[in-house]
Amino acid sequence: ESIGSRLGRTTVELKDICKSYGDKVLMKDFTYIFLKNDRVGIIGQNGSGKSTLMKIIAGWVQPDSGTVEIGQTVKLGYFSQENEAMDESLKVIDYIRNAAEYVKTKDGSISASQMLERFLFPSSMQYTTIGKLSGGEKRRLYLLRILMEAPNVLILDEPTNDLDIQTLILLEDYLDTFPGIVITFRL
């Protein structure tokens, strides 16, 4: 089952968002209110502003005009197209424990080690340094760290990039029971 923090009444509200790069208008007067448990898929051609919209929601990019209101109980988790910088000398288990030792579930709690096993890092790999992982394993580890932070709004920017089939199946199973909002494309 998935984990996530409680989501209050106010979630994420976009009001009259406008964003351009040079002469290219990506969004004009875009308004949307995300509701509890929404599953929102953003579609569009390459370069149409899908990632920019996600970055605006996350606060990584400012709109040219309009407002983004984030509710007080909202905890965003943003899985970007690029991995965050990882300390290659850290052990896998320590990287995850830096996010959380345990995460709460509706049935109790799950340890960082148990979550690592669930995401295909057996105990024999958990004390390996990050520098020894493959690119795909680092991507999976980055995803797990975001999930360990117990977000209730999960933004997945091209989550299928560099994830193997097993990890995609795990992610889909996780999202089936995720008790919050999911915003994504290409899943």
Locate each region found by the language model.
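Conserved catalytic-core segments of large NTP-driven translation/proteostasis enzymes
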Residues: 1
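ABC ATP-binding cassette signature C-motif
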Residues: 4-187
